Amino acid sequence: MRQGQIYPWEQDVATGKQLNIDRPLLPFSFLKMVTIRKFSLKRQRSLELLIRLKGLYPDATCTLTYQTTVQLLVATILSAQCTDERVNKVTPALFKKFPDAVALANADIEELENLVRSTGFYRNKAKNIKTACQMIIDKFNSQVPKQMAELLQLPGVARKTANVVLAHGYGIILGVTVDTHVKRLTQRLGLTEHSDPIKIERDLMRLIPQPDWENWSIRLIYHGRAVCKARNPACDQCLLANLCPSVLQSKVD
């Protein structure tokens, strides 16, 4: 039994005698305070990371090439499991042949497949693009929807694509875009323990102010491409290193 002061939460409420415990029981309010404190520190670190990323990549923006929201939607669908660089090599010919939703909806499926073949999963992507454009015409008056729920009705569109289209097509920030770079970096930075993109997005939305949600994603993507790569990250060159638990852990190991 520990000797010394008896904490209030160690006492029997009826007799006032010390409970038979080997360590002090932490009251709920204390546990809650610790949790809040940890979250507050993580949020402060997230904001410092954002400041540094803004300094590193002040002009960062979406790297996909497009002229209209329909083209942005199509390019973002094509970017699934593919680099923006590869997509940008495909879209000039694609949009020259099929510049809008009507042209894409009426496109010959085999011709569409051939044009997007090099982006991977080309059959599914071509089918989704054609069907999505037909839905835009029939259901949304030929306009790419501005509502998250409506965008998610389109084939080939999950939250990542919807967030990109809303943010860069309409300036509407409703979520955090989570791609492979954002997932990798936020896990390494200790900002999330999840692997599911929706859960990662939820964690990040709690840490970063809403106006910066898309700025955060874009700059993490830039940093993931340039420094914090999937293999052989350049930690010795990283200006985020002293805020990164993965770097600190590797030094201990």
Regions found by a protein language model. Give the residues of each.
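Short intrinsically disordered, low-complexity segments
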Residues: 18-19, 230
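Short, Lys/Arg-enriched N-terminal segments with co-localized hydrophobic residues
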Residues: 22-33
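Catalytic cores of DNA base-excision repair glycosylases
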Residues: 34-253
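Ala/Thr-enriched low-complexity intrinsically disordered regions
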Residues: 14-15, 35
